[in-house]
Design a protein with these regions (language model features):
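Phosphate-group recognition and catalysis centered on beta-loop-alpha active-site segments
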Residues: 2-253
Length: 255
C-alpha cells in the first residue's frame, strides 16, 4: 500500500507540473479579438510558379489588395538587415548556396525568388508597402540562442502604425517579447516534430508538447493543422481558452 501511495503521489505531482508547464498567459492579456476577424495569407498570397512567389513584395501586395492579413518570416543578413525569407538556406527558393546570414543584403540581390523577377525584400520595405492596410503576423526566424534579430526588428515594428503580432518556433524569441514588450500579442509556433520523423531528441519532445509555455506565456499557439490530436495543444485551447491558430490551410474543408 505504501508503494502504491508513493506512485499515486508521484503521478499527481507530475500531472500538476505538466499542467503548469503548458499554461499560457492567463492574466494581463492583450486583446487578440481584432486578429481573429481576418484570414491570413501565409507568406503572402503567393504561387511559386508565378511572378508572385512566397515572401515577395508582389505576394504581399496581392494579399493586401485582396483583403487578407499577411503572415511573413524575418531573419537577419550578414550585415544585420532584417529581410523577409522563410528558409535559413537559399537552396529551395533561390537555388543558391549557403544561408541568408552568410550574405550582406546587397549580395543577396543577385538571387531571384523561384525564378521570378522578385528579389528578397527588406522587412522595412514591406512595412512601408503594407502601411497598416491589413494586420501582420511576423514570424521571427531565430537559430539557436542568437536573439540579435529581436531588438533590431522590434525597433522597426515600434515605429510601424499598423496592427501586428509576433510568433516564433524558437521559445527564446517569444520569451524576449514577454520580457521586453509584454503588451504585444505573442505566439508560440509548434509542430508534431517527432511524428514528422525529421527531428529527434528531448528538445523536440519539449517543443512539440509546449512544455516551455510557462516561460514564454504565449497569447496564442500556432500549430500544424494536420495534428489536432496533440494533447498539449488541445489542453491549451480547451482548458486554458488560449487562442489557437492553424498552419497552413490550403482548403476551406480544413477550417
Amino acid at each position: 500500500m505504501k508503494v502504491l501511495a508513493i506512485i499515486l503521489i508521484v503521478i499527481v505531482v507530475l500531472a500538476i507540473l505538466y499542467f503548469l508547464m503548458i499554461m499560457p498567459r492567463m492574466i494581463h492579456k492583450p486583446d487578440t479579438a481584432p486578429f481573429k476577424e481576418w484570414l491570413y495569407a501565409h507568406r503572402g498570397l503567393h504561387d511559386n510558379a508565378t511572378e508572385a512567389p512566397e515572401n515577395s513584395m508582389a505576394a504581399f501586395r496581392k494579399a493586401a489588395d485582396a483583403g487578407f492579413g499577411i503572415e511573413l518570416d524575418i531573419q537577419l543578413t550578414k550585415d544585420k538587415i532584417p529581410v523577409v525569407f522563410h528558409d535559413f538556406t537559399l537552396k529551395r527558393v533561390c537555388g543558391g548556396e549557403g544561408k541568408i546570414s552568410d550574405y550582406t543584403y546587397e549580395e543577396l540581390q543577385q538571387f531571384h525568388l523561384c525564378d521570378s523577377v522578385e528579389k528578397i525584400p527588406k522587412f522595412e520595405d514591406v512595412l512601408k508597402m503594407v502601411d497598416g492596410k491589413v494586420p501582420l503576423i511576423v514570424e521571427f526566424k531565430i537559430e539557436r540562442t542568437d536573439l540579435s534579430l529581436c531588438p533590431i526588428a522590434d525597433k522597426m515594428l515600434r515605429a510601424y502604425k499598423g496592427m501586428y503580432c509576433m510568433e516564433s518556433f524558437n521559445p527564446l524569441g517569444v520569451w524576449w517579447y514577454r520580457k521586453k514588450h509584454p503588451d504585444l500579442v505573442r505566439g508560440q509556433l509548434s509542430d508534431a516534430f517527432l511524428k514528422e520523423g525529421e527531428y529527434v531528441g528531448i528538445l523536440y519532445f519539449v517543443l512539440q508538447n509546449l512544455l516551455l509555455n510557462f516561460v514564454t506565456k504565449p497569447d496564442f499557439v500556432a500549430y500544424n493543422h494536420h495534428y489536432p490530436e496533440i494533447l498539449s495543444r488541445k489542453l491549451c485551447r480547451g482548458l486554458y481558452h488560449n487562442t489557437a491558430a492553424a498552419w497552413t490551410i490550403l482548403s476551406l474543408i480544413h477550417i
